[in-house]
Amino acid sequence: MSTAVTFFGQHVLNRVSFLRCSKEFIKKSLNHDSTVFIPFIEGEALISPENGDLVQLSNSVKSYKNILSAIVPLYTTLLNTTRSRSDESGINVTFLGLLEGTDSAFNFEWSNISYKGTPYFGLDIRVTESTLFKKVDFEPIFSYPKVTRDHIFKQTNEDASLYSQGKMYLDWLAKYKFCPGCGSPLFPVEAGTKLQCSNENRNVYCNVRDARINNVCFPRTDPTVIIALTNSDYSKCCLARSKKRYGDFVLYSTIAGFMEPSETIEEACIREIWEETGISCKNIDIVRSQPWPYPCSLMIGCLGIVQFNSKNEVINLNHDDELLDAQWFDTTEIIQALDKYAGGYRVPFKNDINLPGSTTIAFQLINHVCENYKNLRKTSSSHL
């Protein structure tokens, strides 16, 4: 498997996940002068109207300092209580990690080890007339434009990766408000990275509250397989067009689908390939992965190598009604398109067909096929 960095997947922060349980650490990091907050409004981040960058709140900007001084000290008193719930407070807050190697004076001692860096938090603003915090507490950022996909794909991978991490945690906090075991309100603990049932009545059984560990109190990530289909010499690549429209352009891409319970990555790939295209493929290699914050997927990028025998490679779209078209394309044609690609959300291919742009794992998988084809040709030529 490749360790190449994908968009949204850059290692930016040391998450120091073992420190989230320390209330002292969270209090100190929330209130430190160097701390940075990435604000979201109703689940979406903001773009600076001045320079188009992802908005990050810190005390170095006066208007942002006014916001932080109004909310952070009060929110700190709500930590690990039901009053911190966004329905009551008007905000969700989650600790993202420490940006190491900065000139921040933040320092925390834990087990005789010193942890240093700039603390980063995600902040989702969901204020109403009845919440503790009000809209006026967050002026002027309520007038800022919200991030669109077009915006985020123009950001640096560092900022996009911070955005992705914050968005996934905050989306989860916003969606899961009540305990599936007893219906009581859930409230965030461990700096917004875990949810806890608020039911204190021990006469009421709750399999969430009483379990030593369970999977509803932690953030969820949905594993999704995405596969570039090729043949044994990489001279062909199967690309498909979904019936879903993506703007006013024609997009052909790789095969993708959610994994199902009790399914291996390889079996999920084999199933998705057959269900969507009718192609029989048994040879699956895992290539690389990409976080995808829409809303909380982990794209597991794979290569499917089809043994052509006039049967395996035959396309049949009649199983699943998801695709509009699927075709085997010559890899040489794709290479020509990638060679001309100058960046952007999509790659012009042939006729009116476009391929996914470089911020997607689909692009990297398609490029992986092309590079394997070129390398195989070089090896063959060297033996002549």
Swiss-Prot record:
Q: Which Pfam families match?
A: NUDIX, Zn_ribbon_NUD
Q: For substrate, which residues are the binding ones?
A: 256-258, 272, 276, 322
Q: Where does Mg(2+) 1 bind?
A: 256, 276, 322
Task: List positions binding Zn(2+).
Answer: 179, 182, 197, 206
**Cofactor(s) essential for the protein:** Mg(2+); Zn(2+)
The UniProt keywords, alphabetically, are: Hydrolase, Magnesium, Metal-binding, NAD, Peroxisome, Zinc
Residues involved in Mg(2+) 2 binding: 272
**Cell compartments where the protein resides:** Peroxisome
Q: How is the cofactor bound?
A: Binds 3 Mg(2+) ions per subunit. Binds 1 zinc ion per subunit.
What is one Gene Ontology biological process annotated in the Swiss-Prot or TrEMBL record? NADP catabolic process
The organism's place on the tree of life at top rank: Eukaryota
The primary location reported for this protein is other
Other information: Present with 846 molecules/cell in log phase SD medium.
- Name the protein family: Belongs to the Nudix hydrolase family. NudC subfamily.
Q: What is this protein called in UniProt?
A: NAD-capped RNA hydrolase NPY1
Q: Which gene encodes it?
A: NPY1
